[in-house]
């Protein structure tokens, strides 16, 4: 093949990958609008756009000024009847718009944005973990990070229930419980990282360490549920479901800050991670320090996972399925696989949120349940496809 034909083939492949990435992003945008529109009180698209244009800091003083002006009008002169009626309609529209702004920006927007950011984090973390461990079944969920977060949250809920008047405060559920889950996730990752430093950071060492962490924290979690009061046990179970109803603007800020912190390192290691898919020997022959790359990627995965699960609870299968879907579409090139895995993770999570709201309009089914139910057949498909490749 000539240089021109090779360059043309490369450009066609790149254009195809960019098209798939753009198409997936459009699907995510459509699902995000659907997620904003669904809920106990339906919201048509034109109302959504009205509330979006009004913004989160909608100026309520305009209606207050207008109401004072209305109070100064004469009782009901014949010439002002139409004006009176028009201002009454104006106030009705103002009140309705304030309600729309409250629902959209105060309740639904934080949940949708948190779902997108959590999907980004889990998709990126899952692809990096499968790459550094050379294991198609590796994910933040299967290696115990989510179990560690669940134990941290259960610990905070249980001890909060022992302190009268503390657990009932809103700040406890929005700050202390997520902080405990975040800290425990980082602690679990630190334990596995320490094992990798003391030994070599081989995939086998990291996988065995992750499995040990998974069973350890699951057993501690079960012990806490056994010892907890019925009220605390119910709160623990609700947290473990994985629910976007727990999202807030705080979870949006933490998720966004974590992504901004980790993305420069992820982008820098893109070529190294792509090369690592060829095997350790090939990567080392090209000058890549494999152990250092694995340890650095493991730290990034721990931060992404901690930010993802600390606020909304355990979300299974997203970090496992999204990387496989991304690689099946764009291949092993991490320049395209990483962003597509992130967007695909968000598509799965927001899609699960929409399905949960449609199936149970009064109270949305937790997304953790939807992703688990949908993830099982996908996992079987991955296993069967891997078996066919091995046989071939």
Give the label of every model feature segment.
Residues 2-392:
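Alpha-helical transmembrane segments in inner-membrane proteins
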